[in-house]
Regions:
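Core dinuclear metal-dependent hydrolase active-site scaffold
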Residues: 1-60, 134-191, 320-327, 345-348
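Active-site metal-binding loops of divalent metal-dependent hydrolases
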Residues: 14, 36-39, 95, 157, ...
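Pre-active-site segment of Zn-dependent metallo-hydrolases
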Residues: 15-20, 27-88, 92-132, 182-193, ...
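Active-site neighborhood of phospho(di)ester-bond hydrolases with catalytic His/Asp-centered motifs
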Residues: 62-71, 91-93, 153, 178-180, ...
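Metallo-beta-lactamase
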Residues: 101-160, 289-329
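Active-site-proximal loop/helix segments of hydrolase catalytic cores
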Residues: 155-160, 166-200, 206-216, 341, ...
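Hard-cation-handling environments
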Residues: 229-238, 244-372
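Conserved small/polar residues in nucleotide/adenosyl-binding loops
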Residues: 397-406
Length: 406
C-alpha cells in the first residue's frame, strides 16, 4: 500500500503452543512466509496452522517461503500450500531440502498406516521440491522486492538456520531476525548457533525451554544419565525403547550409545533403528560440511571411527521383522519414531514392552502437551491407545531412574 514503509509479523501457529510453526512477514510490497509446520497432537483439528487467516489469502500473493529447518513441526504442512495453488520459491539449506522431503513422505506413510487421510499427496511434495532454492549459510539473497535474507547456523539439527531479514533500505531499513529452533552450545553433531548479527531491530525467538522451570542439563550430564540408564536396564536383562525424532536426536543418541559400547563398560547389544532414522542418518553423511569438525573428521576417515557405521546398529526392514523383535526376549535397545509418540512404530513397542517391569521407556526429547509422550512423562499409569479403531487401556509399571535410587 502507498504511504510510509511498514512491517508486520503475523503469528499463524506455534504461539502459546508447541508445533505448527508459521509466521507471515508483510510489508508495503511483499509477503514472506517463514515455516509451515504441523502440530504434534492426536487432535486432528489442531494439526494445521491457520491457513485461512485473511492475511494469507490469496496464496499467489505470497512472494516466498523460508524454511528454518526440517522438523515436522516446521515443514509438515508445506506441501499443502502447493496443493492449493502456491507457485513461488521455497528457500532453505541443502540438508533441509533433503530431510524435509524424506519426512514429508514419511508423514503420508504414517497417516495412511493409522487409517487417516493425509492432508497432501506425493505429487504435492514433488511440486514443492521443484520450487526449492538452495541457500548457503552467510549468503545474502533477494527473496522479495524489498527483502534481503541471510541464513546462519542455528545449531539445532542438520542444516537448521536462523533467518536474518533486511527489509527496505537506507534510514527506513528494518532488520528482523527469526532465531528458528536454536542450540547455544556445541553438540555431538553441530557447532553452537551463530548469535552475532550486525544489528537486530526485531527478534522473534523460540522459547520451548524458556520457562523458569526449564533448566536443561549439560550435554555431558545428559549423556551420562542416558548411559547410566542403559547400563542399569541391561544389567537386569531388560529392553530400552526410546521415542525419537528421525532427525537430530536419533543421531545424538546413536553417538552416545556408540561411545558407551566402545568403552566396554557394558556388553553391547543390538540397537534397532525403526522409522526413517537410517535414511536421515545417511543424509547427515552426505552433508559433512554442516557437521562439527570432530564428527566430520571421523566420518571422512570412515571405518570404525564413523559412529554411524558401528555393527550394533541395525535397521528394522519390515513389519514382520518388527513383530519378531517384539516377541524376542533378548535384551536390546530400540530407537523408533515418532518422537512424541503421536504415531509411528514406537507405539507398537510401547504396547508390547511397557507393562514389563524390567523394561525402560526412555524419553530423550521434548514432549508437547496433548501427546501420548507427555501423558507418560507426567506420570499417568494408565493411558488409552487406539488399535484398529478400538480404544485399549495400557497399564504401566514405572520404575525409579538410577538417579532416583541415589
Amino acid at each position: 500500500r502507498p504511504g510510509p514503509p511498514w512491517v508486520r509479523v503475523t503469528a499463524l501457529g506455534s504461539y502459546r503452543e508447541v508445533g505448527r510453526a508459521m509466521h507471515l512477514v508483510t510489508t508495503n510490497e511483499s509477503k514472506v512466509l517463514v515455516d509451515c509446520g504441523a502440530k504434534p497432537t492426536n487432535n486432528r483439528s489442531e494439526v494445521q496452522p491457520f491457513f485461512a487467516a485473511p492475511e494469507m489469502l490469496p496464496l499467489d500473493n505470497i512472494d516466498a517461503v523460508v524454511i528454518t529447518h526440517a522438523h515436522v513441526d516446521h515443514i509438515g504442512m508445506l506441501p499443502v500450500l502447493f496443493k492449493y495453488g502456491y507457485k513461488g520459491p521455497v528457500y532453505c539449506t541443502q540438508p533441509t531440502r533433503d530431510l524435509m522431503t524424506l519426512l514429508q513422505m514419511d508423514y503420508i506413510k504414517v497417516a495412511q498406516a493409522e487409517g487417516n487421510d493425509p492432508p497432501y499427496s506425493k505429487s504435492d511434495i514433488q511440486e514443492c521440491i521443484k520450487h526449492v532454492v538452495d541457500i548457503n549459510w552467510g549468503e545474502k539473497t533477494d527473496i522479495a522486492p524489498d527483502i534481503k535474507m541471510t541464513m546462519e547456523n542455528a545449531g539445532h539439527i542438520l542444516g537448521s538456520s536462523s533467518v536474518y531479514m533486511q527489509i527496505g533500505e537506507g534510514r527506513n531499513e528494518h532488520k528482523l531476525l527469526f532465531s528458528g529452533d536454536i542450540k547455544y552450545e556445541k553438540s555431538w553433531l553441530f557447532d553452537a548457533a551463530t548469535v552475532r548479527f550486525n544489528k537486530v531491530d526485531t527478534l522473534v525467538v523460540e522459547s520451548t525451554y524458556g520457562g523458569p522451570q526449564s533448566i536443561q542439563p549439560t550435554r555431558q550430564q545428559a549423556t551420562q544419565d542416558l548411559q547410566d540408564l542403559i547400563i542399569d536396564t541391561l544389567s537386569r536383562k531388560g529392553k530400552i525403547f526410546c521415542p525419537v525424532f528421525a532427525v537430530g536426536r536419533s543421531q545424538e543418541v546413536m553417538m552416545a550409545i556408540d561411545e558407551l559400547f566402545k568403552s566396554e563398560k557394558v556388553t553391547p547389544v543390538t540397537v534397532w533403528l525403526d522409522g526413517m532414522i537410517s535414511e536421515a542418518t545417511a543424509i547427515h553423511t552426505s552433508h559433512p560440511n554442516y557437521l562439527n569438525k570432530d564428527l566430520r573428521g571421523k566420518m571422512l576417515r570412515g571405518g570404525s571411527e564413523n559412529p554411524f557405521n558401528s555393527k550394533w546398529f541395525k535397521q528394522v526392514e519390515s513389519r514382520e521383522q518388527r513383530e519378531s523383535i517384539l516377541l524376542d526376549p533378548t535384551p536390546c535397545i530400540v530407537l523408533a519414531t515418532s518422537g512424541m509418540m503421536t504415531g509411528g512404530p514406537i507405539v507398537e513397542y510401547f504396547k508390547y514392552w511397557a507393562p514389563e517391569p524390567g523394561n525402560t521407556l526412555c524419553f530423550v526429547g521434548y514432549q508437547a502437551s496433548g501427546t501420548l509422550g507427555r501423558r507418560l512423562q507426567d506420570g499417568h499409569s494408565q493411558v488409552p491407545l487406539v488399535d484398529k479403531g478400538q480404544t485399549l487401556i495400557c497399564l504401566l509399571y514405572t520404575s525409579p531412574s538410577p538417579r532416583d535410587r541415589g
